[in-house]
Amino acid sequence: MDLLKAADVLSLHCPLTNETVGLIGHEALAVMKPTVVIINVARGEVVDEDALALALKEGRIGGASLDVFIGEPITPGNPLMAVAGDKVVLTPHMAGATMESQMRIITMTVENLAAVIEGREPINLVT
């Protein structure tokens, strides 16, 4: 919690696991600075959208930028849609849609194929 209390920006880049579901909820938001900006490009379920929308509505945090949501595509009924504006940026799961990201994916794929063909372990192997 000390890290959350001190953070000016909280950028989430974690996998969705049992431990990360709802990681940022009422309790976490309550200890953050009123100026903190939360960025979520991980998985929608990591953030409790109702808790985040309430914190934004009440001005308890400075802002948020989300590229992932619990339900995708985001619908008009999502609580974050009601607070979208100057301090809230919502994008349609497109954070990886840059030329740099696409080139990195291609490069890593080719490197992994070569590694497997040569009997080596692929890069970033998930087991």
What residue spans do the PLM features occupy?
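Rossmann-like dinucleotide/phosphate-binding beta-alpha-beta segment
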Residues: M1-P34
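Rossmann-like dinucleotide-binding domain for NAD(H)/NADP(H)
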Residues: V21, T35, V41-T127
